[in-house]
Amino acid sequence: RAVRFVRSHAQEYGIDEADIAVMGFSAGGILSGEMLLHYDGQTDGTALDPEYVPDALDQISADAAACGMIYSFYGRLSVGITDVELLRSGDLPPTFYCYGTRDPFYDQFLANASAAEEAGVEVERLQLDGMPHGFGARGDWIPVYDEWLAGIFER
């Protein structure tokens, strides 16, 4: 609903409704990925809660133009998805992966990004040598992500 809410207020916020991306760090990235893989095309919440009452927001697209996975991946906690067909079925947007080489999930990032590429997802990777999990704003990745995202939005 967050993407739908932002899209419904795009004019008020002074943004192009096509220029909405999702991004998450660690488990937040997994949550963003779950939304993109399984729920962005859902028209309302009744599949999750039979007592849900649909409203006008449910008619607005929840598609995202891009996804930022910052020390994260498409999957569930601690396990990145490597099922190429599942990733292909998600019709995923261009995805930016940023991860450190000292992260305990390093191999998961590599495997998930490779599977996403094989599934036809446009992938950009930024590896930060020596960085652990949870590096936050350290590592000079933000300008790289910003430039990548601006390029996506210019299309």
Model-derived regions: residue spans:
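C-terminal catalytic histidine-bearing segment of alpha/beta-hydrolase fold enzymes
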Residues: 98, 110-155
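Primarily recognizes the serine-hydrolase "nucleophile elbow" in alpha/beta-hydrolase
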Residues: 1-90
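Glycine-/small-residue-rich active-site loops that bind phosphorylated ligands and cofactors
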Residues: 103-104, 133
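Conserved strand-to-loop "acid loop" that flanks and positions the catalytic carboxylate
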Residues: 72, 96-103
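Hydrophobic anchor at the start of a short beta-strand
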Residues: 20, 95, 123
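Conserved alpha/beta-hydrolase "acid-adjacent" motif
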Residues: 79, 104-110
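Surface-exposed loop/turn and secondary-structure junction residues enriched for glycine/proline
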Residues: 16-18, 90, 108, 131, ...
